[in-house]
Amino acid sequence: IAEGLEKLRSRVLIFCYQLSHICSGKSHIQKSLAVWKPELERYTGLVQQIKAKSKERKTLVAEKKELPIYHVKRHKALAVRIAELTEDLEELRFEKALLLQKFEYAEDAGAEAFRKDIATMEACLKKLETREQKYSVELDKALTEYAELKAQAADFDPVELYKARQVIRPAQEKAAEQQLEDAMHEKPSLIMLLSAKQETSHLLGADAEERQARQLIMHRNQEQYRNSLSKRKRNDPER
């Protein structure tokens, strides 16, 4: 029973860690998407402005070239507007270059570069959500099995069961950590592992069990001490 409970506890621990890891990955991707998507819109807007202003400038330059020289007033107006457009285009192109540099894209990269990265992130997010659903189902299953086995252990001495589980636990936890490392191809994060252990204890009600076992141990120790003291008094009437 003790070994079965500890094996199930290890399964719960693994699922808690994996779900926490998935949650962290989802959060990172969602934050990235919250940046990439608005910046794609901004990039698209810059490209459209550059295209529109370039077309307008080209049209005005052609008009100025064909305009008779004696239309002085119109020539001046065209020159002013062309200068404004030239300045606007320089600023827009500079802003576009900075935006591409921010995301480490090549200077000739287009909106497709943004869309490709966004699509990749969204695909990763979908995969994580699928895995999250799978591990949530597995976690619920492990919790149900744990509750059923715990009910079977109701007739066992809680102190002896607690002590037996404490002996088994270190090896089971080590095996769980190795299983995580094998599955994820990296050592588990100590912080996330600690968090997963706390979540496991919470889900299994381990804190209450431990308090109960410790109280029983203390009570029995006190009983043994009182019995021992009483026995010594009976054996030594003069005292």
PLM regions and their residue ranges:
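Extended intrinsically disordered terminal tails
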Residues: 1-239
